[in-house]
Amino acid sequence: MKNYKLFNVGDKVTIVRSHSNDIGQIGTIILVRPSYCKIQLPNGEIKNHTYGQFASLAQ
């Protein structure tokens, strides 16, 4: 199954790998694309992350 079909706008995710200092933060997906998602962090910052860099929170 394609990665982008596993995530929806509004899903809460946690950052597990990153090149910046946002590892461990919980964010909300605001845009889903085939190769990446835009994730809004709690401080209001919006970052692009590829699918291996974040994981869905257990609902």
Name each model-derived stretch.
Residues 2-59:
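Basic/aromatic-rich interaction segments and small domains that mediate binding to polyanionic partners
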